[in-house]
């Protein structure tokens, strides 16, 4: 048995190819069933996200396993092998182990150290558990990878600093305001960045969120998820004074929030401070707003400066994280190798027990027929000894006959002959 990881990710293929090899949540169960029907595949996990599609497998050793798995992947997704073969990567044994640990810890992510990938790996693992698609080795590997990811989070600073625009915007808000729990937030736009911002803010339990968007339909989907109120862009003017924090990210070619609008809001707020974070390009908020007293305006460039500084901190933390992964992968491989000994010991004990049971049955039968008990016990001990030492004796004779000194010494060590 060997552990194998193969996949395609943001570093090896463009999105135009990645989207063609992705597995939808609805298809995972069927894909696992199909995968385990392949010859010599003993267990599998399918991890599929927007940035990667990976298969983690326990397989029997086979010379053409690569060709077999590429063929399965291409048939499943209706692709030609030449379309994907150059973008696929393969990891075996220790490399497969350390790769999964790196993935779960966020060390292989597009955004270094991002935490979302761990949840995605756990979900993929749970899917295989439900479908009974795991081998014992794979189950142990994934459980170990989860504990490694936890170690990386707790023992390093890999996730302490914001390295995405959305996360940086929320981090900035938490730095300026002591608590977000009593604050109202206005989000302008309903695209991917605002979605991430809204989810971050929900985690920090802001008092109230308002989402302003050109169309209500798209905003309503997000609002339903995070528990927010929806307004249209023209309604911003009358609701701006309600907001302590404004975060804007639209595709508008012209500013949506002007200096006059903010002046009116500040007056209505009796000059209570407002934080405005403009992460749109072109800008959604007129730059002159930053000159107003009690209006604290930050642009996407300000956030990028924060991100670059924090990214350097994450890269430094990643060195420590890689050391954790390296040590844990070595420990796991030592455990995996020991499983071969466990099976051998189990077989050896089973063989010895079978011999004992056979000799015992003969002895009891002899006693039942009236044989002398002392003589039966003597013969039992003699025959049992001969049966148990028969195979080791043949191995010793073979090694001696071949002049194999190393093997002879290994057998002596195994039998404990030099311990007394």
From Swiss-Prot:
GO molecular function: glutamyl-tRNA reductase activity; NADP binding
Swiss-Prot/TrEMBL site (Important for activity) positions: 99
Keywords: NADP, Oxidoreductase, Porphyrin biosynthesis
Documented EC number(s): 1.2.1.70
Pfam family, one: Shikimate_DH
Residues at the catalytic site: 50 (nucleophile)
Pathway: Porphyrin-containing compound metabolism; protoporphyrin-IX biosynthesis; 5-aminolevulinate from L-glutamyl-tRNA(Glu): step 1/2
Keyword set includes NADP: yes
Biological process annotations from GO: protoporphyrinogen IX biosynthetic process from glutamate
Catalytic reaction equation(s): (S)-4-amino-5-oxopentanoate + tRNA(Glu) + NADP(+) = L-glutamyl-tRNA(Glu) + NADPH + H(+)
Residues that bind substrate: 49-52, 109, 114-116, 120
Broad enzyme group: oxidoreductase
Keyword Oxidoreductase included in the entry's annotation: yes
Binding site for NADP(+): 189-194
Top-level taxonomic group: Bacteria
Domains as described in the record: Possesses an unusual extended V-shaped dimeric structure with each monomer consisting of three distinct domains arranged along a curved 'spinal' alpha-helix. The N-terminal catalytic domain specifically recognizes the glutamate moiety of the substrate. The second domain is the NADPH-binding domain, and the third C-terminal domain is responsible for dimerization.
Miscellaneous notes: During catalysis, the active site Cys acts as a nucleophile attacking the alpha-carbonyl group of tRNA-bound glutamate with the formation of a thioester intermediate between enzyme and glutamate, and the concomitant release of tRNA(Glu). The thioester intermediate is finally reduced by direct hydride transfer from NADPH, to form the product GSA.
Binding partners and assembly: Homodimer.
Function: Catalyzes the NADPH-dependent reduction of glutamyl-tRNA(Glu) to glutamate 1-semialdehyde (GSA).
Family: Belongs to the glutamyl-tRNA reductase family.
Designated name of the protein: Glutamyl-tRNA reductase
């Amino acid at each position: 048995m060997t552990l194998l990881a193969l996949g395609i990710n943001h570093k090896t293929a463009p999105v135009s190819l990645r989207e063609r090899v992705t597995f939808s949540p609805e298809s995972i169960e069927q894909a696992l069933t199909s995968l385990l029907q392949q010859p010599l595949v003993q267990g599998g996990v399918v991890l599929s996200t927007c940035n990667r599609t990976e298969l983690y497998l326990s397989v029997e050793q086979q010379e053409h396993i690569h060709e077999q798995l590429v063929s399965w992947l291409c048939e499943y997704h209706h692709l030609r092998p030449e379309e994907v073969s150059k973008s696929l990567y393969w990891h075996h044994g220790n490399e497969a182990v350390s790769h999964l640990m790196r993935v779960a810890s966020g060390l292989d992510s597009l955004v270094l150290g991002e935490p979302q990938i761990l949840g995605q790996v756990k979900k993929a693992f749970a899917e295989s558990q439900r479908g009974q698609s795991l081998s014992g080795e794979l189950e142990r590997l994934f459980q170990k990878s989860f504990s490694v990811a936890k170690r990386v989070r707790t023992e390093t600073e890999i996730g302490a600093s914001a390295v995405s625009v959305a996360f940086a915007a929320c981090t900035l808000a938490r730095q300026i305001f002591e608590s977000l729990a009593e604050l109202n937030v206005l989000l302008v736009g309903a695209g991917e960045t605002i979605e991430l911002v809204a989810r971050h803010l929900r985690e920090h339990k802001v008092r109230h969120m308002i989402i302003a968007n050109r169309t209500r339909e798209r905003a309503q989907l997000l609002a339903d998820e995070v528990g927010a109120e929806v307004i249209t862009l023209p309604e911003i003017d009358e609701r701006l004074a309600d907001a302590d924090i404004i975060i804007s990210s639209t595709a508008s070619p012209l500013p949506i929030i002007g200096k006059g609008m903010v002046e009116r809001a500040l007056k209505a707020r009796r000059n209570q401070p407002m934080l405005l974070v403009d992460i749109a390009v072109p800008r959604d908020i007129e730059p002159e707003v930053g000159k107003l007293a009690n209006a604290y305006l930050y642009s996407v460039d300000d956030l990028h400066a924060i991100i670059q500084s924090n990214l350097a901190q994450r890269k430094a933390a990643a060195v420590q994280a890689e050391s954790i992964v390296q040590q844990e992968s070595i420990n796991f491989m030592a455990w995996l190798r020991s499983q071969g000994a466990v099976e051998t010991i189990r077989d050896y004990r089973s063989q010895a027990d079978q011999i004992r049971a056979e000799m015992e049955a003969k002895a009891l039968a002899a006693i039942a027929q009236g044989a002398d008990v002392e003589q039966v016990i003597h013969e039992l001990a003699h025959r049992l000894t001969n049966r148990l030492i028969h195979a080791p004796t043949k191995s010793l004779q073979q090694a001696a006959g071949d002049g194999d000194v190393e093997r002879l010494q290994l057998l002596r060590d195994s039998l404990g002959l030099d311990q007394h």
